[in-house]
Amino acid sequence: STCTIRTGSPAAPRYVAELLYIPPAWVSEHASLIDATSPSGTGERDYALLHITKSVDDAPLPAKFTALPLYDGQLTKNAIRGEVIAAGYPAVYAAGDTDTNLRTRSATTSVSELFTFGKQDVDVLALRGSSMGQQGSSGGPVVNADGYVIGMIATRGNDAADGPGSLRAITIDHINRTITEETNASLNQHLSGDITSRAQIFATTMTPFLTNLLTEEIEQ
């Protein structure tokens, strides 16, 4: 199968990508949900890295892609009540046509609470309700006042506590810690150096195993 990345507003096909990394532990735990129409989860290890290999029209790739900087430090309680911007492509606004009418949106909100999957590390941000709290926002960045991406939208939040459209986002620190734990290489290391070779190694060593897990669930 082909992974096509869309960019712009409205979103249009621009690039072809391959899988660079996905946490095997997450795939193993959630393989049974592959056919679920409305799967849910906590966001723990719920991320993937993609490697852009070419343009859809075979035009030369840019020497460097424009990107927001990642905040790779540990968040503290000072992040609570901090103003942030959440952005993405909430499909609810696409008027039923996500192929041609998917547009970027963003909203200013704030962090209401911090959560951990362990004992003390900040793994999840609770975001107060906003227009971004819609289906399709997952994967969008959460950007702090300094312009750094501190998290990635993962799940719906608790509307009773944080208002309609609340969200939960896993922190960049969570992604960095878990990918380092699983591979002995940090997030920044995965995003630099010989990415093509790293993607090929994952494809030959892990992809067959993960594909088999999913295939077994589908065929049950």
Where in this protein do the model-derived segments appear?
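Extracytoplasmic
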Residues: 1-2, 42-47, 79-81, 106-108, ...
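Active-site region of chymotrypsin-like
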Residues: 53-69, 95-189
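Active-site substrate-binding loop(s) of clan PA
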Residues: 29-41, 53-101
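Conserved catalytic-core segment of clan PA serine endopeptidases
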Residues: 2-59
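Structural recognition of the beta-strand scaffold that forms the well-ordered cores
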Residues: 48-50, 85-86, 151
